[in-house]
Amino acid sequence: MMDLNADLGEGFGNWTLTDDDALLACVTSANVACGFHAGDASVMRRVCDAAAAGGVRIGAQVSYRDLAGFGRRSMDVPPAELTAEIAYQIGALRVFAEAAGATVSYVKPHGALYNRVVWDDDQAAAVVAGVRLAGGAPAVLGLPGSRLLAHAAEAGLPAVQEAFADRAYTPQGTLVPRGEPGAVVHDPDDVVRRSVGMAVERAVTGADGSRIPVAARSLCVHGDTPGAAALARRVRAALEEAGVEVRAFA
C-alpha cells in the first residue's frame, strides 16, 4: 500500500500556484497550506470542500510564518512561539475541514521547517507540542529517522514515514538541499521510475549513486512542479500497474 500526497492551496487572493482540482483527482492525501507560507481563508475553504467531496484526506501543511520566503527560510523561532503557531494553523484548517464534513487527518511541516525538524530536537518537540495543543490525534508525516517522528511516536501520535518522488537524496537518506544542483528531479520518466522503486523495492538511488533504503507509507509529488497534475497521474498509474494499492494512510 502507498499513499500519494501533494501540496495544495498554495496561493492567496488572485494568485494561484497549484492546479488543485486536477491534483485532487489523482492523490489520496492533500497537504493544505494553512496561511503561513501560502494559502488564505478562501483558498483553504475551497480546497477542503473539494477534497472532502472527492474522498481525499486533508492534512495541515504547517510552516514558519514566512509568506515572503514561501516557508523555505530556516528560522530560529522560540519553541513556545512555534508551538502556538503550529496549533494556530491546524485550528484554522480544522474549521474548514469540519465544515466540509471531514477532519484534519494528519499534519506535515512544509519547506524549511520540514528539513529543520529532521535534526533539531527542540523545534521537532515544539511542532509535536503544537499538534497536541490543537487537539485530536492526527498522524504526523515526516522523513524517516527524523526527530519529528520520534517525538510524535513518544507523544502517542501516529508517526508516518514519507518519501519524495521528485527530490534527490543524500547518502544519509535526507533530502539534497534545494539550493544544490540536482536537488529536484525534473525528468518525468525518472520520477516515475523512482516512485515505483521506492514503493516496490523499498529503495532509491542517492545523489552519489548509492542505494538507500526507503521505508515509506506515503509518497509526495510536489504540487508546484511544472506539470504536477500530469506527473501525479503517471505516478499513480505506474504504481497501480506495478501492483501497488494506492490509498490514504489516515
UniProtKB/Swiss-Prot annotation:
EC number: 3.5.2.9
Keywords recorded for this protein, A-Z: ATP-binding, Hydrolase, Nucleotide-binding
GO MF term (any one): ATP binding
UniProt KW tRNA processing keyword: no
Record InterPro entries: Glyco_hydro/deAcase_b/a-brl, LamB/YcsF/PxpA-like
EC main group: hydrolase
Keyword field contains ATP-binding: yes
Matches recorded under SUPFAM superfamilies: Glycoside hydrolase/deacetylase
Signal peptide: none
Coiled-coil positions: none
Catalytic activity: 5-oxo-L-proline + ATP + 2 H2O = L-glutamate + ADP + phosphate + H(+)
One GO BP annotation of this record: carbohydrate metabolic process
HAMAP family on file: PxpA
Complex formation: Forms a complex composed of PxpA, PxpB and PxpC.
Protein purpose: Catalyzes the cleavage of 5-oxoproline to form L-glutamate coupled to the hydrolysis of ATP to ADP and inorganic phosphate.
Family: Belongs to the LamB/PxpA family.
Protein name per the record: 5-oxoprolinase subunit A
Native species: Streptomyces griseus subsp. griseus (strain JCM 4626 / CBS 651.72 / NBRC 13350 / KCC S-0626 / ISP 5235)
